[in-house]
């Protein structure tokens, strides 16, 4: 009861083709591929930014320890 037969998949395919047409489906797939590509590019850009974080120390360590011990 929970599995789909070949007839179910054929009906779904016919409905999708009727709704979108033959020309629209490749266009939708191309747009989805572009979206995935941009998402991956964004993820790698963020990872590269995280690697290049600048570590600055404006205050000497001793002063920071004193401030931390006072709080």
Curated annotation (Swiss-Prot):
It is a single-pass membrane protein. The keyword Membrane applies. Keywords: Cell inner membrane, Cell membrane, Membrane, Protein transport, Translocation, Transmembrane, Transmembrane helix, Transport. It is found in: Cell inner membrane. The keyword Cell membrane applies. Belongs to the TatA/E family. Part of the twin-arginine translocation (Tat) system that transports large folded proteins containing a characteristic twin-arginine motif in their signal peptide across membranes. TatA could form the protein-conducting channel of the Tat system. This is Sec-independent protein translocase protein TatA. The gene is tatA.
